[in-house]
Structures are given as structure tokens and as C-alpha cells.
Amino acid sequence: MLVNQIIPMEVKERICVHCDKTDDNGNPTTYLIAGKQQGKSTEAIRQAVFRRDIILSTEYDFFRSAGMKHACNAAPGEVCHLGLRDIFSENFNINHLKRNSGAVHVCVDNARTVLEELLTDRFNTPIRIDYMSLEA
């Protein structure tokens, strides 16, 4: 179910979530993706996360190309790409996320729980996503 809200997080920051993988025709493949496609199941998201296929991004052009309003705080041309391999690496600094905040965009109802669990485990502190945002 798509809602048009902003997401407060316990870390007081917001994150844009999408997958930048494409098929042979250049079409996006969805694990988590902002836009008009329907999302996959919770388990598909979980598997994608463990394969490190999900990207956290505040890239302006991605949202523009998806036909969406610019929901991030990033200025035009400002890009922050973070693969999950970066987030789960030992030397990842949570302050990098805080400097590059945007909005969370997910396509699956249960994705919130999956992301909360993963981020909570990674940062060893409770992360709560109150509600999600998808702007078509």
C-alpha cells in the first residue's frame, strides 16, 4: 500500500532505499525500488539484503527519472550511494548516513520490519521507522 508521508526514524535521519540493478534491457529489477513497480515479498527483500544487492541512495536524478517528486534532502547533483556491503562493513560510520539523509522509499508492506531489524542489528541500537513514503 502506497502512502505519501515522510518517515521519522529513531536516528533522526531519513534514508532513501532503492535497488540500482537492471536487467539486459536496462529495466530495474526490484528488490527495494522507489517508483511505480510493485515490490517483492519480504523474503525476497531479505535474500537481496544478504546478497548485498540493495543500495541506499539520495541521488536526485534517480527520483526524477522515476517520475517522482524530489523527496530527498540532497541538492541536485549531490549523490550518496551506499551499498549494504558498506553499511555492514566494520569501518562504516553512521555519521555518513546522518549527513546524507533523504526519505525511505519501499514497495513492500513488510519491508519496514526487515529494514528495522537489519539496521538495528548493524548499529546495535533500536531503529524504528514510523511509516513509509512512496511518491508516484
Regions found by a protein language model. Give the residues of each.
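A short, conserved beta-to-alpha structural element at the edge of catalytic cores
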Residues: R128-A136
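Broad hydrophobic/π-residue packing in well-ordered secondary structure
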Residues: A66-G67, A103, A136
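Conserved P-loop
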Residues: N25-I94
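Generic recognition of cysteine residues
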Residues: C16-C19, C72, C80, C107
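Pre-Walker A adenine-sensing motif
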Residues: M1-P28, T42
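Conserved RecA-like ASCE ATPase "motif II neighborhood" in helicase/translocase motors
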Residues: P76-R128
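Generic hydrophobic/packing signal
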Residues: Q37, I45, D53, N110-R112, ...
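Hydrophobic, Leu/Ile/Phe/Ala-enriched alpha-helical segments that form helix-helix packing faces
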Residues: L2, E10, I15, G67-C72, ...
